[in-house]
Amino acid sequence: VIEPDCKKYEGKKCPPDIALVCGTNGREYYNECALCVFIRDSTLKADKAIKIKKWGKC
């Protein structure tokens, strides 16, 4: 399990590149930034604890 490096995306738009990540919630995100945006924008406490389960498809 990998901690996403969300600090590097603060105040920036996500890059358009596709580098799939599989979250510990079982959902796929098109890159690490997209996962960080989901974590940031979620109001659910459980979503704040999502990590990267693995790089690539779930």
From Swiss-Prot:
Disulfide partners: 6-36, 14-33, 22-58
Tissue: Skin.
Pfam families per the UniProt record, alphabetical: Kazal_1 (PF00050)
Chief site of localization: secreted
Secreted among keywords: yes
SMART domains: KAZAL
Domain Kazal-like: 1-58
Protein location: Secreted
InterPro entries in UniProt: Kazal_dom, Kazal_dom_sf
GO (cellular component) term, any one: extracellular region
MF annotations from Gene Ontology: peptidase inhibitor activity
Gene3D superfamilies given in the database record: 3.30.60.30
The entry's keywords: Disulfide bond, Protease inhibitor, Secreted
Function: May have a role in mucosal defense against microbes by interacting directly with their membranes.
Protein's UniProt name: Proteinase inhibitor PSKP-2
Taxonomic lineage of the native organism: Eukaryota, Metazoa, Chordata, Craniata, Vertebrata
